[in-house]
Structures are given as C-alpha cells and as structure tokens.
Amino acid sequence: MKIRELQLQNFRCFNELTINFSDEYTIFIGNNGAGKSSILNALQIMLKTFVFNTQHDLRQSKPDYFARHAIQESDARLKSTEIGSITDQKPQYPVVITISVSMSDDKNISWSYELTNALSRDSKNTAEVLNYVQELQKKITTGNNVVCPIIAYYGTQRQWNKTELRNEKQSSFIPQISGYINSLDAKAFNINNMRDWFSRMLLIERKKAVPEFKAVRQAISNCYRAIDNRENLKDVIVDYDAEKEDIEIQMFYDNGNTEILPLHYLSDGSKSILAMVADIAYRMAILNPHLLENVIQETDGIVLIDEIDMHLHPAWQRKIISALHKTFPKVQFICTTHSPTVLTNVPSENIQILDNGKIYKPNVKTYGRDVNSILREVMQTEIRPSETSKKLSAFDDAIANEKIDLAEKILHELKEQLGENDAEVVGAQVTLDLEKI
C-alpha cells in the first residue's frame, strides 16, 4: 500500500495543493506554520477510512460513520477581509481532501471527503475502499494468507512511558486486525497491547520457536546498529523482560564488556526512535503472523512521522531515514523535519519544501552535502548570526577598498569571536596576507 497523490482544497493554510509521493520516503520541510503537520493530519484523516472500517464488521456498522466526522469546521481555511479598520476572518468552503492509493495487489483506489459548509459533510467514491476492506476481511476470516499493510502515525507527542498506561486494552472483531488499534492516534504508543504481545510471545518461545517474535526483536536490533555504528560495538541483541515489562537493549563490545539497558533508561531521542521501531514491527507481526521470519521484510504500508529529528543527537539525525528504510524496506515513510542534518542523507527528489501555501522541490542536490550549504541553499537560513555575517561582509568591503588597517581590525574582532581556526577566519587571514604583499 502506497500513497500516490493527495489533493487539498481550502484545508487549513492551503487554498489548492496537489502532492505526489515517493514510494520510499518523502520529507517535508518549511518554516513554522508552513503546513507540514497539516499535510500529515490530512493523510491521517483519509487513512482512518481504511483503518477504522477494517476494524469493524461492515455487515453491522454504518460505513458512513467516519465520513460524518472526517473534516471539522476548524479545518477550513480562513480568509481575511478588511472592513474599515476591522479585519474579519471567514472560513472558506468547500473543504475537500482527496487521496489516491495503490494497494499491494496493484489496485488503485481514490476517495474524497468534503465539508460543504459548517453543517454539511459528504464523502465521494468511498464505496470502492469500503468494498476493498470488506474483501480483505473476508480473505482473512476464510484463512487466505493476505498481507495487511501497516498504517501508523507518530506525532510530536509520541513517547514510551512504562508507568503511564494511556491506552486501555482493546481488541478487534478479527484478532489479526488488532494491529490497527490506535495506530493513527499519533499521541502515544499502544503500550498495553504491545506488552501483552511481547509477554505472550515470550511464553510461547519457551516451548517452541516463534519466528515472527524473533523478527520483531531483530528489526529493533538492526535499526539500532544502523544508527549507532560505533566501531567498538560488536553486537546488539534485543530482548523483553517480562518482570520489568520493558524492552531490553543488550550491547556487546569488543573489549568483552556488556551493557544491558531497559528501553525507558535511554535518552528521549533514542527511546522515541526505538519504541517507534518496536511499535511498527510489533504491529506488522500482529497483522501478518503467517509471514513468520519474513514479516518485517515483506509487510508494506504507510508510516507518518512528525518531526522525525525530535530529541535526536545529530549523528542519529543523519542516519535515521536510511535506517528506517533499510529496516522496513517495503514501507512508505512520510515525515517532517526542521533539521538540515536529516537532509544531508536524503536525495533532493525525496524532499518537498512548503512555503506560502505552495510546494517546491529543492533546486540543488542535497545528498552528501554539508549542513551549512543545506541551511543556506535549501532552507534559506543564515548559517551565522546576522552581526557576524555583517562583520565578514565589512572585512570584504575593507579589502576591496584597500583599507588594510580597517581589515586588520575587523579580522582581529572575528578571531576573538570565532577563533583562529574558523574556516572563514583562516580564509580572511590568507586574503589579508596576500593584500600586504
């Protein structure tokens, strides 16, 4: 399952917008308020159509239930109108979201939700996606080994907290579909259900091999190794401590030392990423237990991540996208970020820039570039404080006007501020020395 296209009309800050997505990963960047999270919210709304209806028996539920709650009045774009000295903001209608999705069987499906006015909602072409869901349910209940796609959203409030149990235990009318419970919640991991599954698998594993349980633990280990590739780190093994109800990271070093850390002991950034990987992998195993040891490699789907760089050390920021893609090769990741470090490891064709309600591609290559050039050329951000930039420009002006004494004075100030080993300070010193010859 992959998202091909998203169309927005009068949704939040967007007048009209069409977005196409890469099969592997798409990274959205832009200033605060540019609409990065709004795009994820629009995708969340549309994907809930699939997730909500998959969890319910469509022979008993009303298929249009979610359509009545999809788009809210607060989602309408506001247009400012000047009336004398007063500025009036009026919601613009209709608010329309349309999504086009390709399924794993190459079937293409599109559907729309529309808020015609504050009191009127409508859905279009949802019959096709509902029929697909009903057929999926039928295949599962009759024993067909159909692959269910992972669909999940991890927002900025994502966390793994071993003491705060935010979600009650839940189940689906088809046990296999329990992998979708709260998957688009965005606020927290489904901790209770995940712990229950880990504990149950641990008990079964004492009697016989459980390939899908091994695959889930291996996925967490692989992702950790892909991000934290310290030379002296020999191996990483992931286990589950049933007594402490926590995932354990066991790290083995070349010098023979071993370090065992419960997941909740890790830093917020490490904990957030590894808990997210655990959540994705666990859901895959629930949705597709028949795939056994191949469940991580063979499960496709869509994962939304807001601010993927959140709390991460720059070294992890640089590797996180490639680590997730290698760990879950068939998953389409759609993420937002403020970090230029993330972008240094992402090809420009996978980056979308949001600005003033429009979307653009970077006009320069990004993969392998240094952080400063990404900041300056892609994110349109000064790499130095404005006062420092002005001082560097003043040095250039002094050299151009052959004011050597002034250039020396400015360079002395720059050395005091930046140090003598700063690249531009070194260059300025060379320039000054040449001017004195």
Where are these regions (language model features)?
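P-loop NTPase switch/coupling surface
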Residues: 1-193, 208-211, 222-225, 396, ...
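Extended helical coiled-coil dimerization/tether regions that scaffold
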Residues: 100-102, 175-298, 407
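Switch/communication elements of ASCE P-loop NTPase nucleotide-binding domains
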Residues: 1-58, 246-383
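Solvent-exposed, amphipathic alpha-helical segments
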Residues: 46, 196-201, 283, 391-401
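RecA-like P-loop NTPase motor core
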Residues: 326, 341-437
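Short coil/turn segments at secondary-structure boundaries
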Residues: 166-167, 234, 386-391
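A short mid-domain helix/strand-loop element embedded in enzyme catalytic domains
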Residues: 70-71, 77-82, 243-246, 295-302
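Extended hydrophobic secondary-structure segments that form protein cores and membrane-embedded regions
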Residues: 151-155, 238-239, 301-307
